[in-house]
Regions:
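Phosphate-binding/switch region of NTP-binding enzymes
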Residues: 66-67, 71-132, 140-141
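Phosphate-binding/switch loop-helix module in NTP-utilizing enzymes
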Residues: 1-62
Length: 141
């Protein structure tokens, strides 16, 4: 079970309060906020509400100097909404699994929506609890 979670996902205000309270505890530190997954939280809401909430949330986090990594599961939210949301971020990271089903590999592509440039070829990667994302060939994936 996750340490921080929302039992009732039908309230963006509850999420905002939880996130704000959590971040206040680290106000004097550099913070990297990882939310997995925002797409499931946003399912019950309409397009305008999702976009307004997300735009305001990211603006507030940037003002506080907080680096956000938000995970969105592909295919959960409307494609148009995801395209617009993608423009709210400086960098987008696409993660997926590839290779044989018997031994799948984690793959990553990094890009900027505004320039339309993504890595042409996905790279293998691993995730370390100490160092974060480690690109192959530096790690066994």
């Amino acid at each position: 079970r996750e340490r921080h979670f929302i039992a009732n996902q039908y309230s963006l205000e509850k999420y905002a309060v939880l996130e704000s309270n959590l971040l206040e505890r680290f106000a004097d530190q550099r913070v990297r906020l990882v939310v997995d997954s925002l797409s499931t939280l946003l399912i019950p809401f309409g397009q305008e509400e999702v976009l307004e909430f997300h735009r305001n949330r990211l603006k507030s986090l940037r003002k506080k100097g907080i680096l956000a990594l938000d995970v969105f599961v592909d295919g959960v939210l409307d494609r148009r909404v995801m395209t617009i949301i993608g423009h709210f971020y400086n960098v987008n990271v696409r993660m997926k699994f590839g290779g044989p089903k018997a031994r799948p590999e984690r793959l990553i592509q990094v890009g900027k929506v505004k320039s339309g440039k993504f890595d042409a070829v996905p790279r293998r990667f691993g995730i370390s609890p100490i160092f974060g994302i480690i690109f192959a060939p530096d790690v066994e994936v």
